[in-house]
Regions:
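Solvent-exposed loop/turn segments at secondary-structure junctions
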Residues: 11, 36, 81-83, 110-113, ...
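Redox-cofactor binding/interface segments in oxidoreductases and associated redox assembly factors
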Residues: 76-77, 105
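Short, glycine-/small-residue-rich phosphate/pyrophosphate-handling segment
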Residues: 104-145
Length: 162
């Protein structure tokens, strides 16, 4: 069974968690990168993110090549953006219809996941959600502990599948 980690990272949190997961399972990694992204530390990022989410935007992504039929287990990671997964994940899920996959979801949030898991489950109908985990401000609140949790969680997910 082949493993894939697909993630989007805005501030680096999901990147750190993805790297931790990759460190303990044999997985290919696909980092989603929007062609036009407004990276900023100002409050404008909330305006940009809010507009993207509420208008259900699907930003164009940098080209990637991935054949999802080659993977049985897919770990999907996203920051929480206005109570749901980030718009680049929306693009990926709309462009790549998955069925009969084992899916593990990791999110990085500011402690307000609201409908994120529910929205993932709706977008991923026809797949098995193996497990879900949330990391609250992992870089800010202690990245080493978050990485350890991610590693243990990834191992548990693989054990549940096997």
């Amino acid at each position: 069974m082949k493993n894939l980690i697909v993630y989007y990272s805005y501030e680096g949190n999901c990147n750190e968690i993805s790297n931790a997961i990759k460190g303990v399972i044999n997985a290919d990694v696909l980092r989603l990168v929007p062609k036009k992204e407004k990276i900023t530390k100002s409050l404008f990022r909330f305006v940009w993110g809010g507009v993207q989410v509420y208008m259900t935007k699907k930003p164009e992504l940098e080209p990637y090549k991935i054949d999802l039929s080659q993977y049985d287990n897919i770990f999907i990671g996203s920051p929480v953006c206005f109570g749901t997964y980030a718009p680049p994940i929306n693009t990926f899920l709309s462009e790549n219809k998955m069925k009969n996959k084992n899916i593990a979801i990791f999110i990085c949030s500011g402690n307000n996941k609201r409908n994120t898991y529910k929205n993932f489950e709706e977008a991923l109908k026809g797949n098995k959600i193996v497990d879900k985990i949330e990391f609250v401000y992992p870089i800010k609140n202690g990245i080493e502990e978050a990485k350890y949790r991610a590693e243990q969680w990834a191992i548990d997910c693989i054990n549940k599948i096997n």
